[in-house]
């Protein structure tokens, strides 16, 4: 049998095979036979490479930003007078038991995953609501369904002041059905040894904040009380013709509580 290939001199397959050992007998085509097919014989499919993005990219952490945010919050809380530090849930309950509804304080959370806890006197007695921290913001701890509707704030004092103002606006409202305050589920337990209200966990309690419970050992100075009055009456202290030192003192605590 004769194998014909394209080229100047046809070669016999027998001659080609005879030149190589039996274990390596294979047919090698000359160079002209390996020429590429003309363009258009088979349409080439061009696929563009698109960058593949990770579905769940990890969030970029900012330890320095978190440290500054938490340090600023601690500074505000110490100036407030109603930050009680590392007291337990039982101690907070004793302090708030005989206080009117809406009296509150902020303390350190005994749960390792939280920094602060808001203890408040409700219609069902004192209860505790954890304050969670994430992405340089603070928000009230709630169940998964209502968490997207819970507002976030840059510090704890701003968070508390917002809900105090919201409750005050609802109280002054003349409408028969004022806007409800956030409904929060009762916390399970602030720590394994801490007790909360003896009611089912699924029961919701409307948050009502009226007045802070100032710690006696953190009695607020006359300067601080004057600063609170100025903050309530003036929206922007920078517009006041004050000495720089006094203006700086007002900026150190820009709140009304």
Curated annotation (Swiss-Prot):
Top-rank lineage group of the source organism: Eukaryota
Lineage start: Eukaryota, Metazoa, Chordata, Craniata, Vertebrata
All copies of domain SH2, residue ranges: 82-163
Pathway of action: Protein modification; protein ubiquitination
GO cellular component: plasma membrane
The entry's keywords: Growth regulation, SH2 domain, Signal transduction inhibitor, Ubl conjugation pathway
UniProt-listed InterPro entries: CIS_SH2 (IPR035887), SH2 (IPR000980), SH2_dom_sf (IPR036860), SOCS_box (IPR001496), SOCS_box-like_dom_sf (IPR036036)
The species this protein was found in: Mus musculus (Mouse)
Domain named SOCS box: residues: 208-256
Record-given protein name: Cytokine-inducible SH2-containing protein
A GO biological-process term: protein ubiquitination
Matching Pfam families: SH2 (PF00017), SOCS_box (PF07525)
Record bears the keyword Transmembrane helix: no
Induction of the gene: By a subset of cytokines including interleukins 2, 3 and 6, granulocyte-macrophage colony-stimulating factor (GM-CSF) and erythropoietin (EPO).
Residue numbers spanned by region Disordered: 170-192
Distribution of this protein across tissues and organs: Expressed in kidney, lung and liver. Detected to a lower extent in stomach and heart.
Known function: SOCS family proteins form part of a classical negative feedback system that regulates cytokine signal transduction. CIS is involved in the negative regulation of cytokines that signal through the JAK-STAT5 pathway such as erythropoietin, prolactin and interleukin 3 (IL3) receptor. Inhibits STAT5 trans-activation by suppressing its tyrosine phosphorylation. May be a substrate-recognition component of a SCF-like ECS (Elongin BC-CUL2/5-SOCS-box protein) E3 ubiquitin-protein ligase complex which mediates the ubiquitination and subsequent proteasomal degradation of target proteins.
Coiled coil: none
Subunit structure: Stably associated with the tyrosine-phosphorylated IL3 receptor beta chain and tyrosine-phosphorylated EPO receptor (EPOR).
């Amino acid at each position: 049998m004769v194998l014909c290939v394209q080229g100047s001199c046809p070669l016999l397959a027998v001659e080609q095979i005879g030149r190589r050992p039996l274990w390596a007998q294979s047919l090698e085509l000359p160079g002209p036979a390996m020429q590429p097919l003309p363009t258009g014989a088979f349409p080439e499919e061009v696929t563009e490479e698109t960058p593949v993005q990770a579905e769940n990219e990890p969030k970029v952490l900012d330890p320095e930003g978190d440290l500054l945010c938490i340090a600023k919050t601690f500074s505000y809380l110490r100036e407030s007078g109603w930050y009680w530090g590392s007291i337990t849930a039982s101690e907070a309950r004793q302090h708030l038991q005989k206080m009117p509804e809406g009296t509150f304080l902020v303390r350190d959370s005994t749960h390792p995953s939280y920094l602060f806890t808001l203890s408040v006197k409700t219609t069902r007695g004192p209860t505790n609501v954890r304050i969670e921290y994430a992405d340089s913001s603070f928000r009230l701890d709630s169940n998964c369904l209502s968490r997207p509707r819970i507002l976030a704030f840059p510090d704890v004092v701003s968070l508390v002041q917002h809900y105090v103002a919201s409750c005050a606006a609802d109280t002054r409202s003349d409408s028969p059905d004022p806007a409800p305050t956030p409904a929060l589920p009762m916390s399970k337990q602030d720590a394994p040894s801490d007790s909360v209200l003896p009611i089912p966990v699924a029961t919701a309690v409307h948050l009502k904040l009226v007045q802070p419970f100032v710690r006696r050992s953190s009695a607020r100075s006359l300067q601080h009380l004057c600063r609170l009055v100025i903050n309530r009456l003036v929206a922007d202290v920078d517009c006041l013709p004050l000495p720089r030192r006094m203006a700086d003192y007002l900026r150190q605590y820009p709140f009304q509580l």
